[in-house]
């Protein structure tokens, strides 16, 4: 059976899985209790490095006992984080890559849709669209192309991820030491201007190096979404 998550404002009330962070925390506690008999205060565990390692250890046991339910919980965390505009993919923060340490502009980002389908955690695919607004904090010039302080430019990015079948997800992906739950995916984005001027910004400035990006093996850390929802 293939499951599908459709994340749009109109559909948010009828999502297949739990719709709020409080419910997610309860689902996590119940999963661990069902598979290991432990009644944990997960909100306290994630405060410390040791607590996070303990929690990943329990999740690893849960996956070994009930992989389907643990998969559902992990993907639910990813889905709910996306609803809150937390993509959690460092490569996707392209503005930091371009102007590292420089406050050249402010970026606002909103997830328009985040569609996920899966048969199992090793067969996950995501298609997403994000809206970006850049507000320039200073004048900027590049090869004769001038941008003025206060200018705003608008972009859409189209993101595709797919789990790598040649690196299947197993209990070994629950890395207690590094505090990561690793999912290997192929990663592709395309960045487009929402209007003629914004597209020209992409074509004529250093942003043109980020119009398209492809990575064959990128490690998603699924644990960061659990932490994000519970903190």
Curated annotation (Swiss-Prot):
Lipid group attachment sites (N-palmitoyl cysteine): 20
Topology term for the membrane: Lipid-anchor
InterPro entries (alphabetical): Lipoprotein_3
Signal peptide: 1-19
A cellular component term, taken from the record's GO annotations: plasma membrane
A Pfam family reported for this protein in Swiss-Prot or TrEMBL: Lipoprotein_3
Disulfide-bonded cysteines: none
Localization in the cell: Cell membrane
Lipidation (S-diacylglycerol cysteine): 20
Keywords of this entry: Cell membrane, Lipoprotein, Membrane, Palmitate, Signal
Main location: membrane
Family stated for the protein in its record: Belongs to the MG439/MG440 family.
Entry protein name: Uncharacterized lipoprotein MPN_011
Origin species: Mycoplasma pneumoniae (strain ATCC 29342 / M129 / Subtype 1)
